[in-house]
Amino acid sequence: METRKIPAREDVAAQDKWAIEDLFATDDAWREALAAAKEFIPRVTAFRGHLAESGETLLRFFRLDDEISLAFDPIVHYAQRRSDEDTRVAAYQEMVAQVTRFAVELQSAAAFETPELLAIDDETLNRLYAEAPELENYRLCIDRVRRRREHVLSDKEEAILAAAGEMAASPDDIY
């Protein structure tokens, strides 16, 4: 039986590697994107207590959520792929840890979302849909949240749970 070794990354042909530079050209560009993403936190918290004010407000909140996803996904994937390239490189493990910390901050900032959506009665929700017809694009998301009504914690309890995210990820991030 022949024993084969896994080649070192530098010995793998370029066409067989991830095109990580398609996400960010350099680690510094990734750091800049992560720093810029932190500006989302005050934008999210500005919606606290306001989701039911108008259809337009709720629509702007969901659009911000979309914007965050589009900006944050490449940041997450870059850090994870860099870490996967060579798990011995502490700098890339730290990048994953930074992403995890930021995700926890963002989840904590948005912890009000579910309790506020659940607090909207059906009549008000119908009014919000009428005020902003584009909210229909988010109906499935809203319905999924509202269906879990019996299993959702209060605003403060959701924030505590979100803050525990970094601790829960710790076993995966030890390096």
Regions found by a protein language model. Give the residues of each.
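A well-structured
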Residues: 1-175
